[in-house]
């Protein structure tokens, strides 16, 4: 079975979500430390996918569509190039507009502790990005 991986990119951490291509139901996957070392983050992501036995069809990355030529856009494009080299898969940029506010709204209703809130925020954003991909692109 093939899977699609979604990434919510950040300069400190990336949240990920995954779904198989049949039922298209995204679930939170893992949070990876970045700390401005994109290559290590990509390698850690690759190893985790491989060790967990997932066969990826493609990767989608949340991309801030309305921040023209921002530093985060440049960082995402650099990260995307590293992913393409390491995974040799199609990498699709998906508009992530309003995902942050949607995540905050969902998490507030969950009444989580601060530590759990921060951890869930990264993966839930990736889940929303993957849902958006299935609704609009797939």
UniProtKB/Swiss-Prot annotation:
ATP-binding recorded as keyword: no
Keywords carried by this UniProt record: Cytoplasm, Hydrolase, Nuclease, Ribosome biogenesis
BP GO annotations: rRNA 5'-end processing
Subcellular location: Cytoplasm
UniProt entry tagged with the keyword Hydrolase: yes
First-listed, main subcellular location of the protein, grouped into a coarse class: cytoplasm
Enzyme nomenclature, EC number: 3.1.-.-
GO terms for cellular component: cytoplasm
Pfam families, alphabetized: RuvX (PF03652)
GO terms assigned for molecular function: nuclease activity
Task of the protein: Could be a nuclease involved in processing of the 5'-end of pre-16S rRNA.
Family stated for the protein in its record: Belongs to the YqgF nuclease family.
HAMAP family hit by this protein: Nuclease_YqgF
Full protein name: Putative pre-16S rRNA nuclease
């Amino acid at each position: 079975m093939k899977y699609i991986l979604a990434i919510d990119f950040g300069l400190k951490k990336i949240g990920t979500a995954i779904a198989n291509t049949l039922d298209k139901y995204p679930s939170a996957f893992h949070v990876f430390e970045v700390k401005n070392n994109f290559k290590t983050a990509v390698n850690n992501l690759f190893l985790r996918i491989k060790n967990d036995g997932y066969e990826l069809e493609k990767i989608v990355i949340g991309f801030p569509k309305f921040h023209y030529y921002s530093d985060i856009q440049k960082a995402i494009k650099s990260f995307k190039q590293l992913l393409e080299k390491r995974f040799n898969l199609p990498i699709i940029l998906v508009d992530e507009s309003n995902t942050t506010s949607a995540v905050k709204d969902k998490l507030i209703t969950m009444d989580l502790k601060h530590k759990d809130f921060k951890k869930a925020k990264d993966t839930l954003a990736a889940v929303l990005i993957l849902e958006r991909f299935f609704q609009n692109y797939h």
